[in-house]
Amino acid sequence: MSQDRIAGIDVATNSTDISNIINEMIICIKGKQMPEVHEKAMDHLSKMIAANSRVIRDSNMLTERECVQKIMKLLSARNKKEEGKTVSDHFNELYRKLTLTKCDPHMRHSLMTHLLTMTDNSDAEKAVASEDPRTQCDNLTQILVSRLNSISSSIASLNEMGVVNGNGVGAAAVTGAAAVTGAAAVTGAAAVTGAAASHSYDATQSSIGLRKQSLPNYLDATKMLPESRHDIVMSAIYSFTGVQGKYLKKDVVTGRFKLDQQNIKFLTTGQAGMLLRLSELGYYHDRVVKFSDVSTGFNAIGSMGQALISKLKEELANFHGQVAMLHDEMQRFRQASVNGIANKGKKDSGPDAGDEMTLFKLLAWYIKPLHRMQWLTKIADACQVKKGGDLASTVYDFLDNGNDMVNKLVEDLLTAICGPLVRMISKWILEGGISDMHREFFVKSIKDVGVDRLWHDKFRLRLPMLPKFVPMDMANKILMTGKSINFLREICEEQGMMKERDELMKVMESSASQIFSYTPDTSWHAAVETCYQQTSKHVLDIMVGPHKLLDHLHGMRRYLLLGQGDFISILIENMKNELERPGLDIYANDLTSMLDSALRCTNAQYDDPDILNHLDVIVQRPFNGDIGWNIISLQYIVHGPLAAMLESTMPTYKVLFKPLWRMKHMEFVLSMKIWKEQMGNAKALRTMKSEIGKASHRLNLFTSEIMHFIHQMQYYVLFEVIECNWVELQKKMQKATTLDEILEAHEKFLQTILVGCFVSNKASVEHSLEVVYENIIELEKWQSSFYKDCFKELNARKELSKIVEKSEKKGVYGLTNKMILQRDQEAKIFAEKMDIACRGLEVIATDYEKAVSTFLMSLNSSDDPNLQLFGTRLDFNEYYKKRDTNLSKPLTFEHMRMSNVFAVNSRFVICTPSTQE
């Protein structure tokens, strides 16, 4: 007896603990309420658990742990704290305490399920009160509430009727036990488990429910009528195409299907889950429909976008056909069921026509359509508001994902999308036309550019519209093909069509799917290559043949780049007087006759007259202090197709002519003025050697130094830079198969010459070279002044000698004191002038050496190895290096990295010794 009493005390204590825990859990969920409201909630919870514990245990609803997690998630969303802890943490502690008690697991699962319903209903009530539509009940929670409420109501009605079961125990006994206020009555029965789980007999139960009423058949009552099953299946079929049915309604916010609140109680848990699962196909169907509707604004744009939309509509039409077959099959079976006829002979793409259509069969059927609709939705979603090549590239990215069905689907979509693109390409490369209303073609025509700039600037690539599967070299070929056709038609006035044009167009448009092939060896790529080669050859033959492109390039090299040496020398000799005049006094009409005379007096007279007619001399606008050398230049004028090809290079020739003309100017000053004047005056001033010998000697040395520098510069520029690169250009032009190859080689030739002529280098190179030229001009001025003073003194001495000779003839010997004093004064002034002249010459020489040193330093630090080697050759005997300490210093590591002169075995390279093991 003592042991039974102790066990009873333990059970009572455990029941009290469980009751307290449940009370606190309800407070966590509902909050602190009035006592009568709290007791009512406890009473309702006790009834629900007692009535539905078996239903919860046998169903496939949420597990106990999932219920706890959902409760904590809902409580965490409230952001409410009690005594420094959140409500969810407090509930978690209470749940851990409950698991430590001797509570039946099934009863605890039922308790957590009902607490989840209570939490969800509490949040829903708060959301309605605050008019916040964002909080919605889960579909499965709705199923749970509906099922449990319906079962509870059934049990309550049985209690009122007093129906007894087969064992003579009234249903009121169940509710009587469950109606005990508080949780002790619930948990008391659950706590007795194992050996202590013997059922106690209650004598009051035998006197309840003795009425003479028969017990209904619950198994037959739970069976569903065929019409109800058919309605459920039809609701699922309707949802495939986005149509709402009896059991499935659309959520206006998410667009997904949810169970109907009124009819959810007629569904089992399995049926509800399968309906929600099947309705996913309708959700993705609606997404595809939205993407294929141009009025929504979520679809792709342009003609290629229209092709994608058309393909999506075709996919939807095929899907609708499959769903229609399911619907027809369901209607036939329904009619056969009504008529009592089993139609088992027919078979369709859906389930067998002779068998009943069920949700399980629909689940087996809908997998492939769902997979296809999901990928269509993903692809269409990625293509929103895209067009042209960008649209094609987006779809192209979905290829090769490892699924054969998806690869085939993407290939079909790409084939449809590339149809307009292939037609635009074929029209461009066969006719030279652009049919692009939506600006989705990767070739664009610039309307503001004139015909004279057609070849270089009229047509460009629109890189954002270039598909990923069209490589850049193929895009350039397509661009050049259409551009060549426009060039032949609009400039060369060639109206002939391409050979086999119709056949090429037929091949290209019939093989649109080959445009995104991984290997460019398809018939489509071969057709594009054929068009490119034929058009390029036609343009090249016309430009090299009738329009003499190569001859004109040779003419510009000889006259604008001073390759015809005798011509430029005679031209300067003819215009030397005009070149020294002020710029305002020079007129182009006077120079034209001098140009013609120079052409007739040199080997240029044997050139093609068509080439010579393009050569002209121009006078630029003069500025203050400009002379003829600064404003006179040669110009090569081109017209027609040549202008379209070469007009863009004319500014480069103009830039190149300036340093070459400046170099010729310095050569003319040194040879025809300074040196020639020195040689002519040396004999005349021989008698004054004692007075001017020092200055003359320094002048001769300085002149030789400058002439060596200028001659080296001319040799390097005219031969090593221009001539050598011209030879390379001729080789490339002979091997060229397209006009673009010639133009690209010519452009590279000009850019190389720009570097070799010190034009496109650092500003310090060009500036220091200009300082050298300015010192040469200063030397010319100094020499003119020097010889002027020398000849003035020489003439004074000769005049004095004549006076002495005349006096001797007259018999009067000697000079007057006045004459002697005047002569001595003039000699003294001349000596002072010679000293000043010597110092002035040294200043010019010093400035010259400084400029040359700066020029050499700039060459040594240049990025071009040829300029570095040229700097080394200019100072081959280290003359300037010995006189300038900066040139003797090693280059910094920065310049050593930029330099390509120093080899691996150079002493400037730091070599780490190899470690020996």
From Swiss-Prot:
GO terms for biological process: cytoplasmic microtubule organization; male meiotic nuclear division; meiotic cell cycle; meiotic spindle organization; microtubule nucleation; mitotic cell cycle; mitotic spindle-templated microtubule nucleation; spindle assembly. Belongs to the TUBGCP family. InterPro entries: GCP, GCP_C, GCP_C_sf, GCP_N. Its main location: cytoplasm. Gamma-tubulin small complex (Gamma TuSC) is a heterotetrameric complex which contains two molecules of gamma-tubulin, and one molecule each of Dgrip84 and Dgrip91. The gamma-tubulin in this complex binds preferentially to GDP over GTP. GO terms for molecular function: gamma-tubulin binding. It comes from Drosophila melanogaster. One of its GO terms (cellular component) is gamma-tubulin ring complex. It is found in: Cytoplasm, Cytoskeleton, Microtubule organizing center, Centrosome; Cytoplasm, Cytoskeleton, Microtubule organizing center; Cytoplasm, Perinuclear region. Pfam families: GCP_C_terminal, GCP_N_terminal. Keywords: Cytoplasm, Cytoskeleton, Microtubule. This is Gamma-tubulin complex component 3. Disruption phenotype: RNAi-mediated knockdown has no effect on nuclear positioning in fat body cells. It comes from the Eukaryota.
